[in-house]
């Protein structure tokens, strides 16, 4: 006779979050309210679809699966093998790549694995200077990339704020790096991947492109693809790609074995199979016409904001746009001639219901926790459904706040921002999905 289940165990396994941990449930509900009622304009953030949230909150959370499909160190992987193969196949198809590894937990982990595969400690790495828009993992001295490797940097022209490929070539010829990274965290222009490839070939370097910020634009065919030019390409899945927070790697087949080994066991243990399921869903969505339309609105919105922030009334207040515009999903705002610094401007926009992040501008005189700039992005609002009309309104709210400064009517601007947010409901019915504990 089968014993009755232990009531204590079954109660915990079936009880909702609000009952098990009301503190966390309340905080999730508050965060949902914040996301719904404010305008999210941090360039590295987006909203994952319901299907991705469901995949990432699924029973795959329970499964350990060290290794690769068909070559696991654990039993019971027959279903997660199919999940991972789907994710890999979709990544290869979406970006036209020869191989894909979908196990990196983040973009930083992806970069760490690629560098581990392509370089040895002490060898030379050339990347975009953090102060000019580069990423921590491109050689910043406190990051693993700055500690394990000898680092050189290229930057932007001090007048145009554009990357000068002749200057990159000169730096590479002098520094002779083992790997060149082309990519950025805060640079509003398209990179010349063919020129980077030519320079890498000339100095005998491997080329890694970090497309974490613009991968969604590449997937939609609205941004040049780095895949034909790079040896390896890394990305996150949660920025313009609009999936869950995670990373992936694509590239040439000749590097697959080294990179697979660098991810596991080199950098990570077991992959997060629930997250990989979410990646598979996001990659499927990224191949749809709806996704391409969203990316078009993302680009258009960024250009609308850049144009408004270059208008005479804003320029008169000492506000300018780095490089004079944007080719991508973000606008980098220069406040060096404004009464506002980056921290003050971020706080002001937060008060009116718009979330952005302060960001260094090229050759910024202020410390990193203050900065002289803002980074403003459009992916999350495009995901909500914003088009040119709504982005024009958002641009005017931002322009009014930055041009007026401390004397701005915060209440009036917040009313405008809140009306816009509520006109495009976010996660309608999420409470009923049992994903916020209510």
Swiss-Prot record:
It is found in: Cytoplasm. Its main location: cytoplasm. Belongs to the SHMT family. Catalyzes the reversible interconversion of serine and glycine with tetrahydrofolate (THF) serving as the one-carbon carrier. This reaction serves as the major source of one-carbon groups required for the biosynthesis of purines, thymidylate, methionine, and other important biomolecules. Also exhibits THF-independent aldolase activity toward beta-hydroxyamino acids, producing glycine and aldehydes, via a retro-aldol mechanism. The modification N6-(pyridoxal phosphate)lysine is found at residue 239. Signal peptide: none annotated. Homodimer. One of its GO terms (molecular function) is pyridoxal phosphate binding. It comes from Mycobacterium tuberculosis (strain CDC 1551 / Oshkosh). One of its GO terms (biological process) is tetrahydrofolate interconversion. It catalyses: (6R)-5,10-methylene-5,6,7,8-tetrahydrofolate + glycine + H2O = (6S)-5,6,7,8-tetrahydrofolate + L-serine. This is Serine hydroxymethyltransferase 1. Gene3D superfamilies: Aspartate Aminotransferase, domain 1, Type I PLP-dependent aspartate aminotransferase-like (Major domain). The record marks 238 as: Plays an important role in substrate specificity. NCBIfam families: PRK00011.1 (NF000586). Keywords: Amino-acid biosynthesis, Cytoplasm, One-carbon metabolism, Pyridoxal phosphate, Transferase. It comes from the Bacteria. Its cofactor is pyridoxal 5'-phosphate. One of its GO terms (cellular component) is cytosol. InterPro entries: PyrdxlP-dep_Trfase (IPR015424), PyrdxlP-dep_Trfase_major (IPR015421), PyrdxlP-dep_Trfase_small (IPR015422), Ser_HO-MeTrfase (IPR001085), Ser_HO-MeTrfase-like (IPR049943), Ser_HO-MeTrfase_PLP_BS (IPR019798), SHMT-like_dom (IPR039429). (6S)-5,6,7,8-tetrahydrofolate binds at residues 130, 134-136. Pathway: One-carbon metabolism; tetrahydrofolate interconversion; Amino-acid biosynthesis; glycine biosynthesis; glycine from L-serine: step 1/1.
